């Protein structure tokens, strides 16, 4: 997917298909409640592998069994298709 900045309309449309994600300025985030701390770490590991393959990395905050993923394309100065693509992958991995 492209690294061109998405318009507000494009972001809103994409988020309709990503109901667990919320936008705050130039980033989107999702919090996942895992069954346990080891399950949270396993999820982070799966997301890390997907992020490496995509060459695009989320900010990750781990607090016991609660994991928050935040996406933004810092080099572009906001949200791009790469963020939406990785959000979709994170959703699949978090199921």
UniProtKB/Swiss-Prot annotation:
Q: Which keywords has UniProt assigned to this entry?
A: Lyase
- Indicate whether Protein biosynthesis appears among the record's keywords: no
- Molecular-function annotations in GO: 4-alpha-hydroxytetrahydrobiopterin dehydratase activity
Question: Which GO BP terms apply?
Answer: tetrahydrobiopterin biosynthetic process
- Highest taxon listed in the record's lineage: Bacteria
Return the Pfam families for the record. Answer: Pterin_4a
- Per the record, what are the reactions this protein catalyses? (4aS,6R)-4a-hydroxy-L-erythro-5,6,7,8-tetrahydrobiopterin = (6R)-L-erythro-6,7-dihydrobiopterin + H2O
- Which EC numbers does the record give? 4.2.1.96
Which InterPro entries is this protein grouped with?
PCD_sf, Pterin_deHydtase
EC main class here is lyase
Q: Which family does it belong to?
A: Belongs to the pterin-4-alpha-carbinolamine dehydratase family.
Q: What NCBIfam families does its record include?
A: PRK00823.1-2 (NF002017)
User: What name appears for this protein in its UniProt entry?
Assistant: Putative pterin-4-alpha-carbinolamine dehydratase
Q: What is the species listed in this Swiss-Prot or TrEMBL entry?
A: Nocardia farcinica (strain IFM 10152)
Q: What is the lineage of its organism?
A: Bacteria, Bacillati, Actinomycetota, Actinomycetes, Mycobacteriales
């Amino acid at each position: 997917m492209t690294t061109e900045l998405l318009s507000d309309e494009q972001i809103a449309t994409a988020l309709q298909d990503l109901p667990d994600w919320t936008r705050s300025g130039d980033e989107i985030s999702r919090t996942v409640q895992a069954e346990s701390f080891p399950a949270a770490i396993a999820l982070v590991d799966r997301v890390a592998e997907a992020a490496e393959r995509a060459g695009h990395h989320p900010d990750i905050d781990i607090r016991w069994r609660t994991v928050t993923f935040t996406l933004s394309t810092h080099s572009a100065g906001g949200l791009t298709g790469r963020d939406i693509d990785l959000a979709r992958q994170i959703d699949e991995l978090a199921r």
